Amino acid sequence: MVNKDIVWHEASITKREYHEKNQHKSSIIWLTGLSGSGKSTIANAAARELFAQGYQVTVLDGDNVRHGLNKDLGFSDEDRKENIRRIGEVAKLFVEQGTIVITAFISPFKEDRGLVRQLVEEDEFHEVYVKCDLATCEERDPKGLYKKARNGEIPFFTGIDSPYEEPETPELVLDTGAHNREECKNQLVQYVKDQTK
C-alpha cells in the first residue's frame, strides 16, 4: 500500500512526445519460456538489430536483474511473483520513457504475466512464448542448471519440481525447437516493428 503522503509527480515529457521523437511507440515485449529455451539469446539479438535500425530498445534479463534489483529474492513461488512484479514496474517506467523493453524471464505463472499486462495500456504488452520442449531445454542446458536440479542441488526449478504455465493466447510464439536462432530473431524483430509503428 502506498503511503498517503507520497505524491505522484507527472513527467515533464509525455509518452506521446517520446513516441514522436523516436518515431515509434514504446511497449513491453515479454519473452517467457523454460530455462534454456533461448529467451535471452533471442532478446539480445533482436535488440541489437532494432538498435542498429534506430529504435530505442533495452533488454531486461532475468539473471542480470537478480544480480542487483532482485538479489534479495529466492525462488519460492512468492519470491518469483515479487520478482515479476518488480520487473513489471521497471518495464513500465521504460515504456513511459518511450522505450521498447524486451524482457527475458521464465515468468512461470500466468497470473503474474497478466498482472504485468495490466500495468500498461492494452496495446503496450506483448506476450511472446519462446516455446521449447523440456527435453530439448535439458539437452541444451547452457548453464548446467537442469543437471543440478535433477541432482537436487537447485530446489523449485521450473520444469523439474516447479510448474511452468504455458501462455494460452500469446501474441507471438517463437518455436526454438523447430526454428534456429536467426529465424526466431527475425520473426521477433519484424513483429516488434509491426507493433510499434
Swiss-Prot record:
Pathway: Sulfur metabolism; hydrogen sulfide biosynthesis; sulfite from sulfate: step 2/3. GO terms for biological process: hydrogen sulfide biosynthetic process; sulfate assimilation. GO terms for molecular function: adenylylsulfate kinase activity; ATP binding. Its EC number is 2.7.1.25. Keywords: ATP-binding, Kinase, Nucleotide-binding, Phosphoprotein, Transferase. It catalyses: adenosine 5'-phosphosulfate + ATP = 3'-phosphoadenylyl sulfate + ADP + H(+). The active site is at S107 (phosphoserine intermediate). ATP binds at G33, L34, S35, G36, S37, G38, K39, S40. PANTHER family: BIFUNCTIONAL 3'-PHOSPHOADENOSINE 5'-PHOSPHOSULFATE SYNTHASE, PAPS SYNTHETASE, ISOFORM D. Catalyzes the synthesis of activated sulfate. Belongs to the APS kinase family. This is Adenylyl-sulfate kinase. The lineage of its organism: Bacteria, Bacillati, Bacillota, Bacilli, Bacillales.
